[in-house]
Amino acid sequence: MSEITPEVVESHGLSSEEYDVILKALGREPNLVELGIFSVMWSEHCSYKSSRLHLKKLPTEAPWVICGPGENAGVIDIGDGHAAIFKMESHNHPSYIEPYQGAATGVGGILRDVFTMGARPVANANALRFGRPEHPKMKHLVQGVVAGIGGYGNCVGVPTVCGETNFHPAYDGNILVNAMTVGVADTDKIFYSAATGVGNPIVYVGSKTGRDGIHGATMASTDFEEDSDAKRPTVQVGDPFTEKLLIEACLELMATDAIVAIQDMGAAGLTSSSVEMATNGKTGIRLDMDKVPCREEGMTPYEMMLSESQERMLMVLKPGKEEMAAEIFKKWELDFAVIGEVTDTQRMVLEFGGEVVCDIPLGPLADEAPLYDRPTISLEEYKAWAKIAPITDAPDSADPGADLLKLMASPNLASRAWIAEQYDSQVGADTLQTGGDAGVVRVHGTKKALAISTDCTPRYCYADPYEGGKQAIAEAYRNLCAVGARPLAVTNCLNFANPQRPEIMTQLVEALRGMGDACRMLDFPIVSGNVSLYNESKATGGGSAILPTPAIGGVGIIDDYERMMTMGFKNAGDTIYLVGPEFWATPDPTRSHLGKSLWLDVVHGRDEGRTPPTDLVVERNAGKIIHELIDDGLVNAVHDVSDGGLAVALAEMALSGGTGADVEQNSEYTAAQWWFGEDQGRYVVTVPDTEALNEALSKGTENAETAQIGFRRIGTVGGDGLLGVSLADLREAHASFFREWMEV
């Protein structure tokens, strides 16, 4: 065994203070295997040591929540004996180093988190952030990431139904790749990770262990340096065909009564899976490392425990079920090996070559791992540090039609068809909607459908992390409501920079506070998630810290998919209404919000102003009203108003439906305020029968919840243009960015 020097400790990402804690926990010096295990289990990626204190404050419970944070994925009851199981995970650092494999294995990992719990995956989604398109590496990164996501998801046979892709200079040196999977299971056939039953066999299944991905979790818990190419060996290599076999083999075994517990080997591989299973079961674990299936000669216990080779699972089986399970995995041409047993010691003991090479108490590895309450500053101090001030000289729009064309052609609003065409969105034959406010997939064999949305506005989060956190949750809620779904629960991926900087820690704490307030008001609990910190880069040409990016994945249920709503204009002559805060019906121009708007940035080159506030009461009430209008058949199209404001929402509806609209500006607002302000809590709806709508609204006026929601007639569906611009020109502008960028 190698000598443990201060340099070796530092190379494992451990501080001298943390090493002292290890010495105290063991009562001796660790060997290299033990040091490696501590290093990955105490990494930010596995231990959440900088965020755990604050994550505990999030709302995680509701009558329909079956399992919240702490397991492989969140589980919610969707009725009729079915559960939705879902989670979002990051694969940021690997995707910058090796974009295809980084993104592909991100998809593979999140798929395993979901089917580990007994669900058949039914939909994938993603949230991607890239740097400036003109950055010399960015086209390569975009092409690789998109190909990796598509290549893996398509081969496994799970449709990618929604996602978001944004560009900003803050991601020049540190892109974000967040992947989400949703699965469906029977509520009485959900599998958990707690290893119980002393003497029960521990079984390794899937692919063989190689040297790829060693210290991937540690690498994902530090800032980037300039030598990213040297870190390629820490990026895992995925095989989607093996993953497909693994899904089918696991689901087949799950149909029997053989499994006691199951866990995928994700970050930190065999180490984290075994530690988590024993910790959750309040037991111990003994592994015979000689029995671990390896694909390379001479692998050491250190390498086996820290490898992040893909497509592997760890199980605890009932005694006597090994032979039957082995036959199933043999049929699917996958490795199967009994490598250990559950003990009552609450210790991790590893044996190799007839010797004990690791003997660690589980407490210090998991529940007793370091926990940091890192320094923060006040929100007002933060805004002063970030130089956030209100706009005092907001410009107007001299030609809203011309400005709309610029916006629709800009990287952050341009058509994502180039991306979507690389994803198979229809495999499985249950996809009902893509490219709308939310992706929608049928719950196979039922009338129900799941709606899925991914949302976050990082520029809002930078200017005001609290309001940005609220808005991210609220927009996910709006997007689900807009397709006719009842929002049920949230998963998240919290992407932030170095938490040891008080300003960055403030971003994280305030964003979580905003998210928590929004989830409580909207009855929209958080059931799973992931934290990715140290998203900073010293890479040549890169920026420093990313924008705070708490990516939100929302899931809702549509009880009858025939009532699903889409955004496209349908019928000429339908009346168009703007629905939202009542001050839009009784104008108050002082409340129109151009700060941090895309219009101000794209048209005027000004990334300025404050984040638009999110009124959570308005969000809740407007969502309920939209849901009722859809259920009652009173609207033909619904779309939420977000990036780019009202004009962009109308343009997206026109392009989706293939017909224009005649719309009017409220003269009490400037053209910029009316068409491009990004006030929150708003929807655009089209109504075929205004009398029926008015009758429904008149009945609703007695309901206090409708009192703060205004309806304003703004135009009529029809024609072949919008704001003086032809649909043909709008479509060309919208399609131009990716086509021209990728052809160069």
Curated annotation (Swiss-Prot):
It is an enzyme of class 6 (ligase). GO terms for cellular component: cytoplasm. GO terms for biological process: 'de novo' IMP biosynthetic process. Substrate binds at residues 90-93, 112, 236, 308-310, 532. Gene3D superfamilies: PurM-like C-terminal domain (3.90.650.10), PurM-like, N-terminal domain (3.30.1330.10). Pfam families: AIRS, AIRS_C, FGAR-AT_linker. It comes from the Bacteria. The keyword Metal-binding applies. InterPro entries: PRibForGlyAmidine_synth_PurL (IPR010074), PurL_linker (IPR041609), PurM-like_C_dom (IPR010918), PurM-like_C_sf (IPR036676), PurM-like_N (IPR016188), PurM-like_N_sf (IPR036921). Keywords: ATP-binding, Cytoplasm, Ligase, Magnesium, Metal-binding, Nucleotide-binding, Purine biosynthesis. Mg(2+) 1 binds at residues 89, 530. Mg(2+) 2 binds at residues 113, 264. Pathway: Purine metabolism; IMP biosynthesis via de novo pathway; 5-amino-1-(5-phospho-D-ribosyl)imidazole from N(2)-formyl-N(1)-(5-phospho-D-ribosyl)glycinamide: step 1/2. Its main location: cytoplasm. Its EC number is 6.3.5.3. It catalyses: N(2)-formyl-N(1)-(5-phospho-beta-D-ribosyl)glycinamide + L-glutamine + ATP + H2O = 2-formamido-N(1)-(5-O-phospho-beta-D-ribosyl)acetamidine + L-glutamate + ADP + phosphate + H(+). The active site is at residues 45, 91. One of its GO terms (molecular function) is phosphoribosylformylglycinamidine synthase activity. PANTHER family: PHOSPHORIBOSYLFORMYLGLYCINAMIDINE SYNTHASE SUBUNIT PURL. Monomer. Part of the FGAM synthase complex composed of 1 PurL, 1 PurQ and 2 PurS subunits. Belongs to the FGAMS family. Part of the phosphoribosylformylglycinamidine synthase complex involved in the purines biosynthetic pathway. Catalyzes the ATP-dependent conversion of formylglycinamide ribonucleotide (FGAR) and glutamine to yield formylglycinamidine ribonucleotide (FGAM) and glutamate. The FGAM synthase complex is composed of three subunits. PurQ produces an ammonia molecule by converting glutamine to glutamate. PurL transfers the ammonia molecule to FGAR to form FGAM in an ATP-dependent manner. This is Phosphoribosylformylglycinamidine synthase subunit PurL. It comes from Erythrobacter litoralis (strain HTCC2594).
